[in-house]
Swiss-Prot record:
Name of this protein: CD44 antigen
The organism of origin for this protein: Bos taurus
Function comment: Cell-surface receptor that plays a role in cell-cell interactions, cell adhesion and migration, helping them to sense and respond to changes in the tissue microenvironment. Participates thereby in a wide variety of cellular functions including the activation, recirculation and homing of T-lymphocytes, hematopoiesis, inflammation and response to bacterial infection.
InterPro entries listed in its UniProt record: C-type_lectin-like/link_sf (IPR016186), CD44_antigen (IPR001231), CD44_antigen-like (IPR043210), CTDL_fold (IPR016187), Link_dom (IPR000538)
Disulfide bonds: C28-C129, C53-C118, C77-C97
């Protein structure tokens, strides 16, 4: 019993230690825009995203700022919060990132936790990969915050940046799962050794259709799940495609630089348990019916044979009748013989012939 309580206390301490530590992986800054991942998974809510950017002396970027950063090389393979949207900036098509689309890919989903994207107005206008060594707007707290830069350098600080009590003590312990096509930041070549993100430039083959194309047009075909598609426009007049999270089926679309087609894994329909149980019961009933039918056939199949012999009775009965000139009375002898009896029909025929011969001899003697 003491061992159980000791292990429980040790496990509780480990849980508290894990909850008291936060790792923040950040990318380079592109026109002030950078991506932040918390604890290696989607675990940042919308309110925490704003607090985290504020701790970095930054804000959530707008769509125009995202487009400007993408134009100079900013792209990721994970969803992140911006002002009013959840997006992935893509420059090169990749089948596991943003459904093989390019541009600022907007997601519409019910999932509430993602990464975040921040914008620092004081950052250089181009690409800046210098290490971040401070969390200037973090206040005092018991949490150990570690900033992991793209080059592997780390900066650790005690403090807190979250202001929403639900973010500090979430009611749901398990983190929300990301969409199927963005389970990680990409292949190992697309991630840095420190756990952050590297900007990758992977050129995939692009198919150019012969028919005219509309920019950023999407259509759903052969879908197995319901998806919501729409479009939004920013004040500058640009049009962005909005997609729902795709978990199965196929989608295809054409873009400004070509058409890209992505295919998701087809999900096999799940067989209900009640249907399996019903099929098992029916099979069992069929087997029992066959057994009962075979047993009944064996019982009813024991046929009985009637062997009828015409005889005239015993010797004593036949003598007076023969002397008096009366007609001999015939007597029928009926033998019931089972099909499985040890005596064969030939034996019965032999006995009958013997009796008939005796009758004939007696008549001749009289």
């Amino acid at each position: 019993m003491d061992t159980f309580w000791w292990r429980a206390a040790w496990g509780l301490c480990l849980v508290q230690l894990s909850l008291a530590q936060i790792d923040l992986n950040i990318t380079c800054r592109y026109a002030g825009v950078f991506h932040v991942e918390k604890n290696g998974r989607y675990s940042i809510s919308k309110t925490e995203a704003a607090d985290l950017c504020k701790a970095f002396n930054s804000t959530l970027p707008t769509m125009a700022q995202m487009e400007a950063a993408r134009n100079i090389g900013f792209e990721t393979c994970r969803y992140g919060f911006i002002e009013g949207h959840v997006v992935i900036p893509r420059i090169h098509p990749n089948s596991i990132c943003a459904a093989n689309n390019t541009g600022v890919y907007i997601l519409t989903s019910n999932t509430s936790q993602y990464d975040t994207i921040c914008f620092n107005a004081s950052a250089p206008p181009g690409e800046d990969c210098t290490s971040v060594t401070d969390l200037p707007n973090a206040f005092e707290g018991p949490i150990t915050i570690t900033i992991v830069n793209r080059d592997g350098t780390r900066y650790t600080k005690k403090g807190e940046y979250r202001t929403n009590p639900e973010d500090i003590n979430p009611s749901v312990v398990s983190p929300s799962s990301p969409p199927d096509d963005e389970m990680s930041s990409g292949s190992p070549s697309e991630r840095s050794t420190s756990g952050g993100y590297s900007i990758f430039h992977t050129h995939l083959p692009t198919v150019h259709p012969s028919r005219p194309r509309r920019p950023w047009s999407q259509r759903a075909e052969n879908t197995s799940d319901t998806r919501d598609y729409g479009s939004s426009h920013d004040p500058s007049g640009r049009s962005y495609t909005t997609h729902a999270s795709e978990s199965a089926g196929h989608s295809s679309g054409s873009e400004e630089h070509g058409a890209n087609t992505t295919s998701g894994p087809m999900r096999k329909p799940q067989i209900p348990e009640w249907l399996i149980i019903l099929a098992s019961l029916l099979a069992l009933a069929l087997i029992l019916a066959v057994c009962i039918a075979v047993n009944s056939r064996r019982r009813c199949g024991q046929k009985k044979k009637l062997v009828i012999n015409n005889g005239n009775g015993t010797m004593e009965e036949r003598k007076p009748s023969g002397l008096n000139g009366e007609a001999s009375k015939s007597q029928e002898m009926v033998h019931l013989v089972n099909k499985g009896s040890s005596e064969t029909p030939d034996q019965f025929m032999t006995a009958d012939e013997t009796r008939n011969l005796q009758n004939v001899d007696m008549k001749i003697g009289v």
